[in-house]
């Protein structure tokens, strides 16, 4: 009996170990539920990073290999509470899932932006606005239904294997800015009006979705039929002996 259960568990784990772009597609946000990718975080026309109400992170992915990230982090200072630092980061680009299940994200170098507030360092009254480029490699990830909230949850393992805070599906299709370069530097660079049109088109699918509706029943059907098949074979073997 235990051998049968072991075979079933092993087979299910093999079926489950199938990372793909389709299951990543959508906009994911952290528990604060205040940080989302898209024009509500970064305005590429007027070069503005917009501060959310609370810190948090958000990632968006498309099924054809594009991503966007919005990060708002606050770091306290235990020696002086007035010296807390805050940073807003926007990046977008392309991503790929490697054969080992790791996730590699390559940003468009000219588009990354960072807004740093460091009252006891850089300036007490001004924030520092700069370009930002940081490729990202996540060791692994998995998508599952959160047992508490019933929402789809994305759990990411960072490059060192440590767990990132869980992310929950907020938008599907993803809420993103245009996936091409927003700030091209060549002679064919876009005017602000053409960029505005692109941003407007990118918002056509701006609507919320309950993550429960995005539950991937098709994938879990694989588990069911795999388990039924193994149990059937094992039962037949026991009967014949």
Swiss-Prot record:
One of its GO terms (cellular component) is endoplasmic reticulum membrane. Residues 241 are cytoplasmic. Residues 1-17 form the signal peptide. GO terms for biological process: 'de novo' protein folding; budding cell apical bud growth. One of its GO terms (molecular function) is unfolded protein binding. It is a single-pass type I membrane protein. Pfam families: Rot1 (PF10681). The chain crosses the membrane at residues 223-240. The keyword Coiled coil does not apply. Keywords: Endoplasmic reticulum, Glycoprotein, Membrane, Signal, Transmembrane, Transmembrane helix. Residues 18-222 are lumenal. It is found in: Endoplasmic reticulum membrane. Glycans are attached at residues 80, 100. Required for normal levels of the cell wall 1,6-beta-glucan. Involved in a protein folding machinery chaperoning proteins acting in various physiological processes including cell wall synthesis and lysis of autophagic bodies. Belongs to the ROT1 family. This is Protein ROT1. The lineage of its organism: Eukaryota, Fungi, Dikarya, Ascomycota, Saccharomycotina.
